[in-house]
């Protein structure tokens, strides 16, 4: 992010689409009571501010992922961007109001009043910390949820 701030207005800056999409997986082993509840997982999806993450990580140069396929990587049979076509059916829009409602329902179903989650990222990446900070900030708006961050090298957290 610091280098982007420094060079963002430079006419020499060239921006290329990346062929990667970063995503999260929820540990559903049962070790964290609550993550097996579909309403809680959906609430976390709705409470994930993808645009906020993209902005904090790239100073607005990246776009928020709307699916597993990166924008500009593949075309549909009609020549359109496959990522845009697929997003219509799969994307979660940031909706903290709906997230709070679903989270409360899920917590009640799971018999929980409080829950602590740990989000992990790699210390090998220059963007992991700002990504985790944004996730922590938005998820902790859900009543009863505490979010901890864990950074480690890929062999520890990947």
Predicted features, each with a name:
Residues 27-34, 40-43, 83-92, 121-125:
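Second-shell loop/turn segments in exported
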